[in-house]
């Protein structure tokens, strides 16, 4: 298997493990000294153990739907919908790899929002979706 296929497979398993609640398998993709940044809150988590502990301690029921994984070499991006207690949040995860493991990840979160009326004539619904009202 070529290196990009191996990395994609590792990311896919990361998200499958996240969905099934297997925190050990979910975090196997991270280097021991990996860094996870949440730029919107200003938080940084150092090391696989800290990353795993903060995710494992989340109080909400979570479900993960992967929309897209793209990348090559050391830089990969996942777009997901993470549903917390039934409420969807869109997430973009930017992962930097070295020696087969994530060494740095930045994860961004965005709640759905209503589309403003001024651009209604310019937009069409995304596949499988309807346009939310403001």
PLM feature spans:
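Short, low-complexity N-terminal intrinsically disordered segments enriched in polar/charged residues
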Residues: 1-32, 122-134
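A solvent-exposed, acidic/Ser-Thr-rich amphipathic alpha-helical stretch
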Residues: 5, 20-74
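A beta-strand edge to alpha-helix "cap/lid" segment located at domain peripheries
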Residues: 1-3, 52-134
């Amino acid at each position: 298997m070529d290196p990009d296929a191996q990395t994609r497979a590792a990311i896919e398993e990361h998200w499958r493990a996240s969905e099934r609640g297997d925190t050990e398998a979910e975090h196997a993709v991270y280097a021991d000294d990996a860094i996870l940044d949440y730029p919107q809150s200003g938080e940084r988590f150092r090391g696989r153990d800290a990353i795993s502990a903060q995710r494992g301690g989340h109080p909400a029921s979570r479900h993960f739907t992967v929309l897209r994984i793209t990348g090559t070499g050391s830089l990969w991006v996942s777009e997901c919908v993470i549903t917390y207690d039934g409420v969807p949040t869109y997430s973009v995860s930017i992962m930097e790899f070295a020696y087969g493991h994530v060494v740095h990840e930045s994860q961004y979160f965005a709640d759905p929002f209503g589309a403003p009326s001024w651009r209604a004539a310019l937009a069409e619904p995304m596949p499988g979706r309807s346009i939310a009202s403001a």
